[in-house]
Regions:
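Non-catalytic nucleic-acid substrate-recognition regions in nucleic-acid-modifying enzymes
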Residues: 20-162
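Compositionally biased, low-complexity flexible segments
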Residues: 1-14
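Conserved class I S-adenosyl-L-methionine
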Residues: 216-221
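C-terminal edge-of-domain segments
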Residues: 164-177
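Basic Arg/Gly/Lys-rich low-complexity intrinsically disordered segments
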Residues: 1-2, 19-21
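Short coil/turn segments at secondary-structure junctions
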Residues: 1, 125-128, 189-193
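SAM-dependent Rossmann-like transferase core, predominantly class I methyltransferases
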Residues: 175-213
Length: 221
């Protein structure tokens, strides 16, 4: 979808289109085998169902709105993150990947004084090096900013302001923006990890699988 033109001045965030009611493509990763429970949870939290939900192993795609993004980040027990898809296209070479990333209006989402990192996952990808694929995305982001403003954001692997996710699936590539920041199992309440900590998302998945906790309605019959 088209994005309004926006620029970041100094360290300020751009005016993002968060209040618009346009449809967004979201991906919610989860532990393998948990995706059906996650689909039920998303349905219970947002009302999304049918063609608005696509279940895959290790996550679900959802067609939602910004209000759904906020609600899922706040209330989801099972999702690891809430990712917003900004681009998806056939991509069989590093040059094609660079061109895809260069077309994304990153300046609508963050500015030159913000830091970012690129994480990459793959399933059946033809790319020889995932690290090089991530590097090409970093180059494209930096070059786009430099072309438009004469400056570029810095890469920061630890606690960046922005996380970009690159997913390579066969001959296709997706670029997604992380709306969650820290993984959703890190809610900030745990003071002591203990000897064998259990991730909150995994604990919730175990409860869902046991039948102890059931959403009010199922998204998938």
């Amino acid at each position: 979808p088209a994005r309004p033109a926006a620029r970041a001045a100094g360290g300020a965030w751009p005016t993002m289109p968060c209040m618009s009611d346009e449809a967004l493509t979201l991906f919610l990763p989860c532990a393998a085998g948990v995706q059906d429970f996650l689909a039920d949870e998303v349905h219970g939290l947002t009302g999304l169902a049918g063609q608005d939900l696509l279940i895959e192993r290790g996550g679900i795609y959802a067609r939602g709105r910004w209000r759904d993004v906020m609600r899922l980040n706040l209330h989801s027990r099972l999702a690891q993150r809430v990712l917003l898809e900004l681009a998806h296209a056939p991509c069989e070479s590093e040059d094609a990947l660079y061109a895809l990333a260069r077309r994304v209006p990153w300046e609508d989402w963050f500015g030159t004084r913000h830091t970012f990192r690129v994480d990459v996952t793959a399933r059946g990808s033809a790319f020889k090096s995932l690290q090089f694929a991530a590097l090409r995305v970093k180059d494209a982001v930096a070059d786009r900013f430099r072309e438009r403003s004469g400056a570029r954001p810095s890469v920061q692997t630890q606690q960046p302001d922005v996380r970009i996710h690159l997913h390579l699936d066969g001959a296709h590539a997706s670029l997604l923006l992380d709306t969650s920041g820290e993984p959703l199992f890190k809610r900030g309440w745990r003071q002591d990890k203990g000897d064998a900590p259990l991730k909150e998302t995994l604990a919730a998945a175990m409860l869902a699988a046991s039948g102890w906790w059931q959403p009010a309605r199922r998204a998938v019959a």
